[in-house]
From Swiss-Prot:
One GO MF term attached to the UniProt entry: oxidoreductase activity, acting on the CH-CH group of donors
Keyword Heme: no
SUPFAM superfamilies: Inosine monophosphate dehydrogenase (IMPDH) (SSF51412)
Gene: guaC
PANTHER family per record: GMP REDUCTASE (PTHR43170:SF5)
Catalytic reaction(s) noted: IMP + NH4(+) + NADP(+) = GMP + NADPH + 2 H(+)
Alphabetical GO biological process terms: 'de novo' pyrimidine nucleobase biosynthetic process; purine nucleotide metabolic process
Protein name, per record: GMP reductase
Length: 327
């Protein structure tokens, strides 16, 4: 791999503005059969999303993916969302009972609009088999498969029938895969996204390493259709995590999906817990993201998201540590 870089190493170069106000810029994106207000999706993690937030997002035309850490609630969740005329977007793993779950959905004529196969190392036969299983029993569901970090993986999962792939191995703020295993896209997530996107024929979801709203625009520039974000969505009033007070400031807990806090045991731990400053309402953050992205589009010299895909950029080497103090 040559020319390796991450979000903080890149600056996009402005093109002549053609709008009078950024409010003329359209941030919508289509994924599958549906159109969404922003190319952004909160991470399918237990401290980021719950039923209430999923409902709010769906009602307001934002994409969401429900986590898979309360598997027994998924059927009622799908029913509930679809009965309200909202999209049902769920996560599955690859263990044996997940195969039965997919068959149960088919038997009950429940077809979630989106199913995300959510595995730390998605370039595996286990994921390929699950893609094929879902496509056989629920052919109408849009399948997102991940996570991966190489062009080979993207091609294999697409060939198996995935409708989109999710790219990112361990770049997340509460992910310590890069430290624990020596593997991953932490520190070069943006270059990995670019590498994978060049091989892709279907949409890519960039997952992890986003630290600023500008990173969303950079992800779009390097080939993402949708951007999954954890830490920036953690710590809101609505967030599921616990609120605590420290030195007169409010904080919320945020932990990784493979952390001991998630698993309830210290086994194969590749995630950590942190406390993030309380951020106020989720709605305010989503509005700010939209406005910042509208500004990005105006700097790109266009009126739509796609205009960002063709801008020039420079590499300004800063730090390989992705803005995180690892130790």
């Amino acid at each position: 791999m040559e020319n390796v870089f991450d979000y903080e190493d890149i600056q996009l170069i402005p093109a002549k503005c053609i709008v009078n106000s950024r409010s003329e810029c359209d941030t919508t994106v289509t994924l599958g059969k549906h159109k969404f207000k922003l190319p952004v999706v909160p991470a399918n993690m237990q401290t980021i999303i719950d039923e209430r937030i999923a409902t709010y997002l769906a009602e307001n035309n934002y994409f969401y993916i429900m986590h898979r850490f309360q598997p027994e609630k998924r059927i009622s969740f799908i029913r509930d969302m679809q009965s309200r005329g909202l999209i049902a977007s769920i996560s599955v793993g690859v263990k044996a009972d997940e195969y039965e779950f997919v068959q149960q959905l088919a038997a009950e004529h429940l077809t979630p609009e989106y199913i995300t196969i959510d595995i730390a190392h998605g370039h595996s036969n286990a994921v390929i088999n699950m893609i094929q299983h879902i496509k056989k029993h629920l052919p109408e569901s849009f399948v997102i498969a991940g996570n991966v970090g190489t062009p080979e993986a993207v091609r294999e999962l697409e060939n198996a029938g995935a409708d989109a792939t999710k790219v990112g191995i361990g770049p997340g703020k509460v992910c310590i895969t890069k430290i624990k295993t020596g593997f991953g896209t932490g520190g070069w997530q943006l270059a990995a996204l670019r590498w994978c996107a060049k091989a892709a024929s279907k949409p890519i979801i960039a997952d992890g390493g986003i630290r600023t709203h500008g990173d969303v625009a950079k992800s779009i520039r390097f080939g993402a259709t949708m951007v999954m974000i954890g830490s920036l969505f953690a710590g809101h009033e609505e967030s599921p995590g616990e609120t605590i007070e420290k030195d007169g400031k409010l904080y919320k807990e945020y932990f990784g999906s493979a952390s001991e806090f998630q698993k309830g045991e210290k086994k194969n731990v590749e995630g950590k817990k942190m406390f993030v400053e309380h951020k106020g309402s989720l709605e305010d953050t989503l509005i700010e993201m939209e406005q910042d992205l509208q500004s990005s589009i105006s700097y790109a010299g266009g009126t739509k998201l796609d205009s960002i895909r063709t801008v020039d950029y420079v590499v300004v080497k800063n730090s390989i540590f992705n803005g995180d103090k690892v130790y």
